[in-house]
């Protein structure tokens, strides 16, 4: 969601943080395999810092938000596996255009580039179980062979000692 209001940025980020934390707590109580599209980390490590850098969240609000996030994370464990879809800017723009969401039509390329840089920086420092998938190479939503390759990568990362060699 894009907006230009310092007044609402903190409130909105707290809303998302609260919602995602509830999801994390619910997941921790469940023994089933759960796949999330968006993680709690993205709000705290990508979007809130971006709003702060853009001057849309005050330093005081950002510090309070970050402290609350750190406290919440001390109460739950990291996911069994974080999957990061690494993508070029042209591919990201293509995917956004394919979605056709009205509110995304005015997104600026420099905004997308900035978010992508934040994602790349954050993922480099992620210390838990991580699988990076080249989203420019693997079109797993359209190509069954790519879907199979990606599911095999996930399976190997979660359960395999030795990846299969083709």
Where are the regions that the model predicts?
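NTP-dependent small-molecule kinase module
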Residues: 93-166
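Conserved nucleotide-binding/hydrolysis micro-motifs of P-loop NTPases
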Residues: 40-42, 87-92, 137-140
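Hydrophobic/aromatic beta-strand patches that form the interior of the parallel beta-sheet core
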Residues: 36, 81-83, 131-133
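A glycine- and Lys/Arg-enriched "phosphate-lid" helix/loop adjacent to the NTP-binding pocket
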Residues: 45-118
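A structural motif corresponding to the C-terminal end of an alpha-helix
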Residues: 30, 72-80, 121-131
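Glycine-rich phosphate-binding loop used to anchor ATP phosphates in small-molecule kinases
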Residues: 7-77
